[in-house]
């Protein structure tokens, strides 16, 4: 079953971006928010209520601007929102793993340790012979793609890059680097997407 997935990043409370999201969401089956939807958690509750009002499943990870505990609490209160920090969610043949990766370092040892749970889940599902596509939701983009480039320098996560390559992740939806927004790139077998605040839609 093909799903229309709308992914968006780094909204930072922009009313224009939220209005665009509300229009685009009408055509989506699932919405994925890859962090930094606020500025330092300002107006976090009304923004998340707008996400909830989309009446679609909305998967959210935090970026460096959100308070994770507050986001988790609101996700628990709002019926359409799913808190995805270090969480796995399966929909049909899609295995989705969310992680609020550190956007300010090349190496993220916490991610390298915790992401092994996704590797275990992939192995179990493959043993059953089920067709499977994997999506990593990461605030930090993988190192060495259009998604993490500022001028001529790459500043993404080498931990995310290595994980995607080693485990043949199908899609990596990311954000954080505003200069890399609205880009799609390929990292070996992984399609890397930094959708920016106006979002991008994919049929998967």
Where do the PLM segments sit?
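Cap/insert and terminal regions of metallo-dependent hydrolase folds
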Residues: 38, 51, 55, 139-177
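Active-site environment of divalent metal-dependent phosphoester hydrolases
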Residues: 12-17, 38-43, 64-72, 104-107, ...
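Proline-centered loop/turn at the N-terminus of a beta-strand
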Residues: 57-59, 82, 133-135, 170-171, ...
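Conserved catalytic scaffold of divalent metal-dependent phosphoesterases
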Residues: 13, 66-156
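Core catalytic region of metal-dependent phosphoesterases/phosphodiesterases
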Residues: 8-91, 195-198
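Binuclear metal-dependent phosphoesterase catalytic core
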Residues: 2, 17, 88-93, 109-114, ...
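Divalent metal-coordination and catalytic microenvironments
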Residues: 10, 31, 36, 63, ...
């Amino acid at each position: 079953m093909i799903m229309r997935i709308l992914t968006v990043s780094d909204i930072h409370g922009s009313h224009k971006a939220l209005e665009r999201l509300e229009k685009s969401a009408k055509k989506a089956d699932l919405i994925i928010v890859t962090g930094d939807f606020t500025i330092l958690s300002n107006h976090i509750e009304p923004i998340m209520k707008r996400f909830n009002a989309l009446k679609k499943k909305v998967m959210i990870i935090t970026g460096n601007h959100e308070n994770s505990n507050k986001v988790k609490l609101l996700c628990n209160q709002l019926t359409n929102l799913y808190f995805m920090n270090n969480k796995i969610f399966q929909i049909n043949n899609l295995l989705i793993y969310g992680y609020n990766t550190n956007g300010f370092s090349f190496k993220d040892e916490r991610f390298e340790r915790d992401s092994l749970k996704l590797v275990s889940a992939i192995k179990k599902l493959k043993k059953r012979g089920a067709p499977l596509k994997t999506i990593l939701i990461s605030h930090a983009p993988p190192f060495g793609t259009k998604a993490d480039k500022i001028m001529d320098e790459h500043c993404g996560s080498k931990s995310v890059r290595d994980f995607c390559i080693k485990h043949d992740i199908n899609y990596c939806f990311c954000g954080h680097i505003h200069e890399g927004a609205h880009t799609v790139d390929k990292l070996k077998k992984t399609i890397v997407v930094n959708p920016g605040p106006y979002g991008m839609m994919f049929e998967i």
